[in-house]
Amino acid sequence: MTQTFDPITLELLWRRLISLVDEAAAALVRTSFSTLVRESYDFSCIVTDDAGQSLVQATESIPSFIGTLPATVKHFLRFFPPDQLAPGDVLVTNDIWLGTGHLPDITVAKPIFRNGRLVAFSASTAHAPDIGGKIRSPEPREVFEEGFQIPPMKLMRAGGTDETLVTLLRKNVRTPDQTLGDLWAQVVALDLMEERVTALMDAYALPDLRALAAEIHGRCETAMRAAISALPDGTYRSELQTDGVLDKPVTIRMALTIDGDTIDIDYAGTDPQVDRAINCAMCYTYAMSVYGVKVCTSPTLPNNEGAFRPIRIRAPEGCIVHPQFPASGGSRMLIGHYLPMLVFGCLGQIVPDRVMAAYGSPMWGMNQSGVRDAMAGEPSKPYANMFFFNGGMGATLRGDGQTCLSWPSNVSSTSIEISEHISPLRFRHKRLRPDSGGAGKHRGGLGQEIMIESRSATPIAVSFLAERTIFPAFGIHGGSAGAPGVLRINGEAVDPKRQYVLQRGDTVLLATPGGGGHGDSTVRDASSLQADLRAGYVSGNETGRHA
């Protein structure tokens, strides 16, 4: 007999599940070693049912992992069917096509058993501080250049660690203590989720999670289908160009078809994959596409498998959003972060009040690799790290774009104090970019300007994640484009898709793009303009542009 739940019990169980993954996420942050997890929150924790279908995701998670993480658990099940799993096993991979689209993201999952029967998985993805290979940049031509590849395998068997894998990983990364420290922090999070899930099942006498999963998935699927059904049927198209590589832009095309209570997204006509590391694996394409649909149709709906069942994503094999092995993809967000904008371009034709102008993303980042000078009590040693810098969001019908906010990712920036402590870099300044937000009835969010100086006694290799230096974030409904991004080394403009070496005293200037404006700037509220002037968001000689 199928177990049923009254509304109150269902809500209690659902909220308990969300609470336990949030608790695991907090534990991961508190036990992690790298700033990418501890400060930037570049990770996710989920619980799935026994088939790998996501039930709940931690509240403060990376949006793309909503789509990639449960898919990876399903891939684990293909490699390790239930009869090949045991209590205490921990599965691991960073495979580009089975994971998140680039090697630095390490995914782990732990089967949860009850009375000898597989009932669920706890799982986590986290961005490792280093995964070996060439310093992360758009330059690698094949995945083999990008670092240490971990096929789907067991990190732990019945509670025992695969020391061979650990030794290989330690030998192949620049920051073994941080990389392995974060990996074990992920395992701690898995253990905590397992403990809390089994306690919840005991408290409510649940023999398994299938009935609960069916309720959660069914309700979210119904809600998403209802939201889609409220939209007019039809095929809507959009396309855009990215800065691309080697002075050649990349064109991405989308056709979004609404048919009753389903949405079909097709990337036919998109440019082919390239021999640079901006290729966006299908797993990431799927995740960014469904996320764009969700924020336009049902943004408050909890994230789980049911919410995405009515959405289908297709792309031709070999195009840049469905690259084939051995394509490189370490900088896949330089393509993937544009995909929600394409969804907005399609849905904005029928629900213009729900979309924003173009945003100043893909997010910017600065990768560094070198030798950190000896510090008090510590010898000099290799280091590798990454700092994120965000541009401005696009304006909407409701108001101005948010300033320096990461979207469609939601990573945080590492504080200057911590950044300077862990690296031989000095931040000369970090400030908002006046006049960078696109003019409009509602102004685009501002970008920021960061000046960094190398204080290292030895050379530092640096590379960047940077877009919208050629094509700025456009405005909509009469709004103006935001300011394009700027990247300079020692005052000279440089190609953001290349790797460089900094000597002591060299400086890097990163000026992130502003978001696009919304509506005619000539009807901007006078009080809003005066507030912008007082805050320094616009300058006196730019008032005409922002009036």
Where in the sequence are the language-model features?
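Glycine/proline-enriched, intrinsically flexible loops and inter-domain linkers
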Residues: M1-P87, V92-A547
